[in-house]
Amino acid sequence: MASEQSSPEINADNLNSSAADVHVQPPGEKEWSDGFYDKEVINGNTPDAPKRGFLGYLIIYLLCYPVSFGGFLPGWDSGITAGFINMDNFKMNFGSYKHSTGEYYLSNVRMGLLVAMFSVGCSIGGVAFARLADTLGRRLAIVIVVLVYMVGAIIQISSNHKWYQYFVGKIIYGLGAGGCSVLCPMLLSEIAPTDLRGGLVSLYQLNMTFGIFLGYCSVYGTRKYSNTAQWRIPVGLCFLWALIIIVGMLLVPESPRYLIECERHEEACVSIAKINKVSPEDPWVLKQADEINAGVLAQRELGEASWKELFSVKTKVLQRLITGILVQTFLQLTGENYFFFYGTTIFKSVGLTDGFETSIVLGTVNFFSTIIAVMVVDKIGRRKCLLFGAASMMACMVIFASIGVKCLYPHGQDGPSSKGAGNAMIVFTCFYIFCFATTWAPVAYIVVAESFPSKVKSKAMSISTAFNWLWQFLIGFFTPFITGSIHFYYGYVFVGCLVAMFLYVFFFLPETIGLSLEEIQLLYEEGIKPWKSASWVPPSRRGASSRETEAKKKSWKEVLKFPKSFN
């Protein structure tokens, strides 16, 4: 095999290829329509997956990290926006003047729009840019949407006393972040090894929580400025995050599924080999490429992918689309953005003079809790995570809302708040965020990223994710009005939603732990009952241990095992 190192220059040819001018000589003379992999080539033995030591795991996570960093963009916006709405200079530039108090303020409408315009852009961007993944490749599409994100940041920074210009910039900024919310989990799910797919897709959510945390820290650091640096510095830092993603795309392998769909089979082998740190001629690599190719050919026999295909009952795509839409909708109806968007305001209302500091505490809990999710999601399974998350968040939200309604203002809304009740609400908010960050926050993206056949994946993921941003817009815009009217009774609305989430997951969402993307297709086609799906074994593995057993066998000692050269 010969390979030439490609130029680091960012262009379509570079980003659409995992390794330029690479030639792979497959065993035998078979065409790809029949498959490269042949059991006779390896003496009738099915090739084993490559064994990984610490270095192998490290390489996989480092290669996937630049893709997952796309989650940092919406997280950063959530973190800085929560601080902006309480900054004096920001309110002076984009708010209204109240003569009775001599202060600037943001009306409920303007505050709601400030929070929600980003979500509007994201919902449009996710649908509008998803098609680029099929025409230009996943990596180049990500670079394009990140450039759009940078344009939106420029418009925001240049705004001066023109709230409508700032909002336009916020929408364009959201277009790019929305594109990332579809394209990044898509690419992660397609390059990740099956046994690590859940954890690697969870990195997207981990970076979102990292963005929220650093966003809180940023506005905490600039809040004492008296000029526009108070909010322009956090917005300006967006360019640094965007450049990290763009440069990172030079290192990430292209999706082997996209390459095979484009008849670039040899490059697909190189992509699989790169992420697994083996030779492109390894029999296991050829077998993986052959399985992907078989899935692509099977999808082609069903005809060209169209928007109409999303409503197909025969291939169970409609069922999966409904699941994707509802899972992304439920992700917002957990009530998490009630805390993340308005956390600073909420904790001022419970008697804390510096809500910025409390937001940093919440951001820290959110970030480190998501690290736990990355570590365990491929051992516990999707259903168990979601069911536990819905039940535990329900309990936390009931307590939070009840304390707010019954105990926070013992002498009425016009009287002083109870410090003890306020502290208890903060504690249960932290419990709630822990439960959310370890379950629904990462797993919702995993479910959507791995549920759809490659032929309709970009369309189905874009629609599912658009509902996430749509509900984020609705919650972000209407929360100031609702809390102003019913105060902490608002928490009971989310409790009802959490009950519905638990029931839906139990009766309608199948378990996909340990399955390849092609095997998930078979799971849906066989119509397995969701509550029995954890014990389902794909045809190629029948007679072996169940998927849950195999996942549990992999101890953390094995995952963190150092190669001999390290000992």
Curated annotation (Swiss-Prot):
Extracellular topological domain: 77-112, 161-170, 219-232, 354-359, 406-427, 487
Compositional bias ranges of the Basic and acidic residues kind: 545-555
Entry keyword annotation includes Repeat: yes
Positions of transmembrane segments: 56-76, 113-133, 140-160, 171-191, 198-218, 233-253, 337-353, 360-377, 385-405, 428-448, 466-486, 488-508
Stretches of the chain found on the membrane's Cytoplasmic side: 1-55, 134-139, 192-197, 254-336, 378-384, 449-465, 509-567
Keywords associated with the record: Membrane, Repeat, Sugar transport, Transmembrane, Transmembrane helix, Transport
Main location, first listed in the record: membrane
GO cellular component: cell periphery; plasma membrane
A GO term for molecular function: carbohydrate:proton symporter activity
Topology term for the membrane: Multi-pass membrane protein
Subcellular location, record wording: Membrane
SUPFAM superfamilies linked to this entry: MFS general substrate transporter
Any one biological process term the GO annotation gives: carbohydrate transport
Region feature (Disordered): 1-32, 533-555
Ranges of compositional bias, category Polar residues: 1-19
PROSITE patterns: MFS (PS50850), SUGAR_TRANSPORT_1 (PS00216), SUGAR_TRANSPORT_2 (PS00217)
Family: Belongs to the major facilitator superfamily. Sugar transporter (TC 2.A.1.1) family.
Purpose: Probable glucose transporter.
UniProt-recorded name of the protein: Hexose transporter HXT15
Organism: Saccharomyces cerevisiae (strain ATCC 204508 / S288c) (Baker's yeast)
